[in-house]
């Protein structure tokens, strides 16, 4: 699907060294489509970043939920949860830039707030496991 291709390309562009601010013009050029074609799938660049954040949340919390269901030992849960987050960032350097907020500096502030909510939820899950 084109939406997934757009998000994958955006994430790949974020992996590039020195990728400060990614423009829709650069993204459309990389995909060899018009900017209008991007906007047929996403109303704004902020929505594209929201798509990446959705992917991050789904990926990380699906694994965390599996850890909580399978492991009764709180220390094991916390260790595995930390490992999940670190390995996700390592395997997805473009997404790690979104998670750290580096890729969101010049974007809509609600995206930074959304990543903060992700980490609040992550921290809450860690605390819950330690109770």
Q: Residue ranges of each PLM-predicted region?
A:
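A helix-boundary/kink motif common to multi-pass secondary transporters
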Residues: 18, 43-44
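Alpha-helical structural segments
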Residues: 4-12, 16, 29-30, 47-70, ...
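Ser/Thr-centered, proline-biased regulatory motifs
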Residues: 20-29
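Residues within the helices of the helix-turn-helix
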Residues: 25, 36, 46
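Short coil/turn segments at alpha/beta junctions that flank glycine-rich nucleotide-binding fingerprints
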Residues: 16-20, 71, 92
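Short acidic, glycine/proline-rich loop/turn micro-motifs
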Residues: 64, 109-112
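Short hydrophobic/aromatic patch on the recognition helix
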Residues: 32-42
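Amphipathic alpha-helical segments used for helix-helix packing
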Residues: 90-110
């Amino acid at each position: 699907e084109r939406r997934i291709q757009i998000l994958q390309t955006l994430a790949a562009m974020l992996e590039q060294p020195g990728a400060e601010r990614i423009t829709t013009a650069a993204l459309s050029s990389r995909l060899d489509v018009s900017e209008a074609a991007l906007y047929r799938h996403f109303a704004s660049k902020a929505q594209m970043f929201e798509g990446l954040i959705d992917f991050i949340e789904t990926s990380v919390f699906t694994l965390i939920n599996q850890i909580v269901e399978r492991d009764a030992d709180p220390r094991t849960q916390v260790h595995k949860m930390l490992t999940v987050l670190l390995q996700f960032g390592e395997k997805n350097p473009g997404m790690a830039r979104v998670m750290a907020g580096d890729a969101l500096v010049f974007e809509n502030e609600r995206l930074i707030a959304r990543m903060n909510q992700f980490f609040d939820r992550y921290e809450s899950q860690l605390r819950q496991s330690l109770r």
